[in-house]
Amino acid sequence: MHSYVRPNQFVALRLPSEFTKIQKIEPDSTVFLGKFGSFPANQIIGRPFYLTFEILDDADEKDGSCLRIIPAAELHAETLIAEGEGDGEELDTNEDGTPMRTNREIVDDASTQKLTWEEIEALKKESGGAGREIISKLLESHQTLDQKTSFSLAKYMLRKRRKYMKRFTVLPLDVSILTNHMMEDQGAARIMELRDEMVGLLGCWGNVHHGGDASLDEAIAAKPNGRYLVVDDTGGLVVAAMAERMGILYPHDGDEYEEQGSSDEPKKNEAEQAHDDEQPPTESSTHRPARPAHMSASGNSITVLHPNKQPNLSLLKYFGYSQDNPDETHPLHKHLKTISWLQLLDPNADPIYSEEPEIIPESELYTMKSNKRGAYYRKRNRWTRVQSVVNEARAGEFDGLIVATVMDPSSVLKYAVPLLAGSAHVAVYSPSIEPLTELSDLYSTAKKTAFINRRQQLREQKLQQSSDQPDANETELQDSDLSELMAEFYLDPTLLLAPTLQNSRVRPWQVLPGRTHPLMSMRGGAEGYIFHAVRVIPTQQTIQAAGNLSRKKRKVVTQETPTTAVDSGSGVDVEMKS
């Protein structure tokens, strides 16, 4: 992530009213903040994040306003003064220890404020001190200000600052800020009411992390790491959260990206470089260079599974990536792959996959117009990319499955779980608990036991029937067993282990002596739940837990103890035999 504001970048502007405005900073433009005013965008380009600015009216400026950076001492001056005044102050208390000074006798209505609405509006037009003069006038004209407690006065001052102070803080736009902004201001239904804490829990239980950097030879020789299969109906929010955890969400800085880009290319040693420099330019050096083929990342990638012709990843535009016009320098250009359900289940029915464009010789290509030649290369590259992504996805061996969809989760897991590698994590989000409880029942221990017993019965029946037919193939018998099992069971419950349901919600509280309670203004909505399980590879052999039969029992040797004579004076009864 960049450390300062760059041109054409989306940033988050935190206003005094606690409202977050997401704005694209375009050069030579004006940013409007509603009642808080406006300012030129050029005045914050190149400045670091987390600075608080104050909008001042300045007639000398072209736009009529300028910005002033508020230092930390001034920003927290009110808090420091309030803490200093409260030190050593002793309040009068009653017999039970409660403070005598309360707000019960205060009637906070319009009659307590001498300033009228017309006078306040006139002060807004005349004052250029970013709202400080209005707040001071309101405090001077308040009749019951001296009767307020320190806590009530602090809340009153906070409300007036949020209403009249012309300040804003520039924050870098990350997934957490975007999630809270979508939940509070842009409609939570667009992201399935996925809260910030649930986004973190989804990535945690899905074991989403960076797969590590590996060279091309190592990736070919071994299995690539960090390959995740995603079903996202939140507009790309889940994909953005995963990419942030994997380190492929934000565009590279200019200098750093050039260094990383040059490291990916094969470097020549000093002798070869010197030899190339000494060679004079030849006629072949002016020949048209070969068009580079599109290379996709083999590891540390995200494969999005979607039901439409194109996936809905509109929220990725806030992080510099557009699906319609992708930037080739963005990390997601190589690490993000898309595949439809049709291409996964029946790829031959998709014309993009099955119909290969006509191959045109190079000699004929040079005679074509540039627009036709470019269209030909785009079709060939698109077909090659679709072929590669579909074949790679159908081969499976993914390291994790993340699902946040409005479809039935069981229908998604029926076809997606077999594509996972062993020990891969599965995390499914749902706003309500009912779809996930049904999913937990499908993968429960009782269903596993019934599935295994029924499979064993079918195999025994097939073996008895095939005893009369010695030419019967064993693989055909197994396929017939699976077909009959899938008719009775919706999915294979032996593919996932330890299904659990998770829930988490952050609730803000007001913490005061005797007045501690959750904030009444907190947002409601769906709780949100997560289903988690681990992919296992079931064995094809019958397992019988009979214990260790080779272990021998230990023999207990009893020794006879000699009897001793009993004294008559010991008080012990002795049986006398004649």
Swiss-Prot record:
GO-annotated biological processes: tRNA methylation
Comp. bias (Polar residues): 297-306, 558-567
Single GO MF descriptor: RNA binding
Bias-annotated ranges (Basic and acidic residues): 264-278
Top-level division of the source organism's lineage: Eukaryota
Function of the molecule: Substrate-binding subunit of tRNA (adenine-N(1)-)-methyltransferase, which catalyzes the formation of N(1)-methyladenine at position 58 (m1A58) in initiator methionyl-tRNA.
Family: Belongs to the TRM6/GCD10 family.
This protein's name: tRNA (adenine(58)-N(1))-methyltransferase non-catalytic subunit trm6
Naturally occurring in which organism (per UniProt): Aspergillus oryzae (strain ATCC 42149 / RIB 40) (Yellow koji mold)
